[in-house]
Amino acid sequence: PEVPSAMPFPTDDQRDRPWLMRTYAGHSSAKSSNELYRRNLAKGQTGLSVAFDLPTQTGYDPDHELSRGEVGKVGVSIAHLGDMRSLFDQIPLAQMNTSMTINATAPWLLALYLGVAEEQGAPLDALQGTTQNDLIKEHLSRGTSLLPPKPSLRPTKAVILFTTQAVPHWTPTDDSPSHP
C-alpha cells in the first residue's frame, strides 16, 4: 500500500474510498428490514445502521408480557440467531460496515452478528462496524439497564477487549454524549 507523505494524510486508496452512508433503519420483522436494507444498498447506500425495537434493546423475549405492543414498533425485533440470519440474508457482511445502536444487549447481539458472519465465511478481521455499547447511558438517560452500574461495566469491557483483539476494524463502543 502507498504510504502517506506526512502527517496523518490518507493514501490514494483511502482517499478514493466512497463516504460511508448508513440510514438508521429497522422495522417490523427481520425479513422486512432485510428487504429495506437491500433496497437501500441497491440505491447506493454503503453501510447499514440497525435500529432495534424496545424488547430487543431491553433483553425481553418478543413473547414476554412486557413486550406486548412493542415488538417491531421502533425497530427490528431480534430474538435469536434465526432472526439475525434473516436480517442479513443475501447481505455479505465481509463487505459491509454495520452500526448497531444497541447498549444493554450489545454483547448478545454482537455475538449473533458474528455468528451470521461466520456462517457466511467472513473472517473476523474483514468485519467493519460499530456497537454503541454505552451501558452507562442506559443508567443515566434511558433507565433501560439490565444490571446495576458497576456490573454493567463487565460486559462493556468484554466487548471492547474481544473486538480490539479479534475484530480489529470494529468500533466496540460509541459513547453517546448527546444524551443528557
Q: Where does each model-flagged region fall?
A:
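Catalytic alpha/beta active-site cores
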Residues: 1-180
